[in-house]
Swiss-Prot record:
Keyword annotations of the record: Ribonucleoprotein, Ribosomal protein, RNA-binding, rRNA-binding
GO molecular function: rRNA binding; structural constituent of ribosome
Subunit note: Part of the 50S ribosomal subunit.
Name this polypeptide is given: Large ribosomal subunit protein uL24
One GO BP: translation
Organism: Bacillus anthracis
HAMAP family: Ribosomal_uL24_B
């Protein structure tokens, strides 16, 4: 997967197109990510030990990783991700600026 937890991304397609946020959780096996403030759904929950009140909870749902693009750290624009080997380690780079994405 070209994105990781903590990456700043922009949604490029779907109902939340144009929104930006940080990846909270990545699910590599399903190729899905949860982005902060994107794809908000309402979940109806029964009263339980943790939530004695129950009711309707709003939370982020996963979206497919192909619907997000990482933001270039230099320009702040959406960019594709490239890979390069530096000192025997595989690192991610932004295609637009050539900037390193991995610290």
């Amino acid at each position: 997967m070209h994105v990781k937890k903590g990456d700043k991304v922009q949604v490029i397609t779907g109902k939340d197109k144009g929104k930006q946020g940080v990846i909270l959780v990545a699910f590599p096996k399903q190729n899905r990510v949860i982005v902060e403030g994107v794809n908000i759904v309402k979940k109806h929950s029964k009263p339980s030990q943790l939530n004695p009140q129950g009711g309707i909870i709003t939370k982020e749902a996963p979206i497919h990783v192909s619907n997000v693009m990482i933001l270039d750290p230099k320009t702040g624009e959406p960019t594709r991700v490239g890979f390069k080997v530096e000192d025997g380690k595989k690192v991610r780079i932004a295609k637009k600026s050539g900037e390193l994405l991995d610290k």
